[in-house]
Amino acid sequence: MYKTFLIKYAEIAIKGKNRYIFEDALVKNIKYQLRNVDGSFEVRKESGRVYVETDGDYDYDETVATLSRIFGIVGICPVELHEDEGFDKLCEAVIEHINHVYKDKSFTFKVNARRARKNYPMTSMEINAAVGEKVLEAFPETRVDVHNPQVMINIEIRPMINIYSEEIPGPGGMPLGTAGKAMLLLSGGIDSPVAGYMIAKRGVVINATYFHAPPYTSERAKQKVVDLAKKVARYSGRIKLHVVNFTDIQLAIYEKCPHDELTIIMRRYMMKIAEHFADEDKCLGLITGESIGQVASQTMQSLAATNEVCHMPVYRPLIAMDKNDIIDISNKIDTYETSILPYEDCCTIFVAKHPVTKPNINRIKKSEERLNDVIDELMKTAIDTTEVIMVDAE
């Protein structure tokens, strides 16, 4: 079993003078995510690479699965490290690597050498050719294919010689915590968990607000949202979830406002409450799972009407995505099956038969004036009675 993993990253490498900030954040996140994995791990960075070193007694599959969910990582390479004892020893190490990893030697290959240590006495091209020749001598059944090889034999000349031929893809993106914090409006649907995942992939720490409407929505609906948060937390880390009792506000809107405007007005008050908690939590914006035209409340005019009540930016990472693309991501991050469980949330009750799709903001504000005698107290009660749940990965 491999004792060391070479961690590759992409965008971090072009960050110039601030690169160390992103590297340090990545190292910190790797240590945090590995804390519950069986085994002992040391994480260190070294000239454009991060290494995860183990004591050899660890759960390989769980370790790889955990690393493959850490934003900022583009590749996870089980690697063999060797002292530089000359070119002949390097070739011997490559032969041993192939013997160890591949039972069937009838494959095509390419040698890909990289010299991080420029004082090495051979160029990368010379290493490629010479090592390739040694591999062909040792394993005559192999063939060279520089265009589409079945096996890529990677050699990195660093303080230690790095040899690896497997690269497990990571999620990419930027390390968590390098781009501030934002508040996700999380429901039990397909879209908002995906939106949270995508914004977290850009380095944003996410908190969340969920609007609960008992007795019209059940405890199972609430648990469904908590379960979704747990799945997102596998990528984003711990999520602070605000559970808001929205029932009385919804009932007041239903009783006093035009029914074709119910959804827009409810969304506006949801945004106000979510922004309140975002301010408290020092977030820099709100996140929603809205996509243009997907439902009546997500036309351009409707989005403008909900935006109008917000002072901070509203980020919509799914805004131009097709539903099938969103579903693909939800399957990838394992939220889809939970999202389609048949428990209603507050966005699916009190829905108008014919909701307005091109709301006029002045008319909406006029309708909201009907709530003036009750809304301040209802908002205060909803905020004061909000339950906070700290959600960790499942």
Swiss-Prot record:
Pathway stated in the Swiss-Prot or TrEMBL entry: Cofactor biosynthesis; thiamine diphosphate biosynthesis
Reactions catalysed, as given in the entry: [ThiI sulfur-carrier protein]-S-sulfanyl-L-cysteine + a uridine in tRNA + 2 reduced [2Fe-2S]-[ferredoxin] + ATP + H(+) = [ThiI sulfur-carrier protein]-L-cysteine + a 4-thiouridine in tRNA + 2 oxidized [2Fe-2S]-[ferredoxin] + AMP + diphosphate; [ThiS sulfur-carrier protein]-C-terminal Gly-Gly-AMP + S-sulfanyl-L-cysteinyl-[cysteine desulfurase] + AH2 = [ThiS sulfur-carrier protein]-C-terminal-Gly-aminoethanethioate + L-cysteinyl-[cysteine desulfurase] + A + AMP + 2 H(+)
Major localization class: cytoplasm
Superkingdom of origin organism: Bacteria
EC number assigned by the record: 2.8.1.4
Entry annotated with the keyword Nucleotide-binding: yes
One function term, GO molecular function aspect: CCA tRNA nucleotidyltransferase activity
Keywords associated with the record: ATP-binding, Cytoplasm, Nucleotide-binding, RNA-binding, Thiamine biosynthesis, Transferase, tRNA-binding
GO biological process, one term: thiamine diphosphate biosynthetic process
A Pfam short name: ThiI
Binding positions (ATP): L185, L186, Y210, F211, R267, G289, Q298
Occurrences of domain THUMP (ranges): 61-168
Subcellular localization(s) per the UniProt record: Cytoplasm
Top-level enzyme category: transferase
Recorded GO CC terms: cytosol
Matches recorded under CDD domains: PPase_ThiI, THUMP_ThiI
Homology family: Belongs to the ThiI family.
PANTHER family in the cross-refs: TRNA SULFURTRANSFERASE
Function according to Swiss-Prot or TrEMBL: Catalyzes the ATP-dependent transfer of a sulfur to tRNA to produce 4-thiouridine in position 8 of tRNAs, which functions as a near-UV photosensor. Also catalyzes the transfer of sulfur to the sulfur carrier protein ThiS, forming ThiS-thiocarboxylate. This is a step in the synthesis of thiazole, in the thiamine biosynthesis pathway. The sulfur is donated as persulfide by IscS.
Protein name, per record: Probable tRNA sulfurtransferase
Native source species: Agathobacter rectalis (strain ATCC 33656 / DSM 3377 / JCM 17463 / KCTC 5835 / VPI 0990) (Eubacterium rectale)
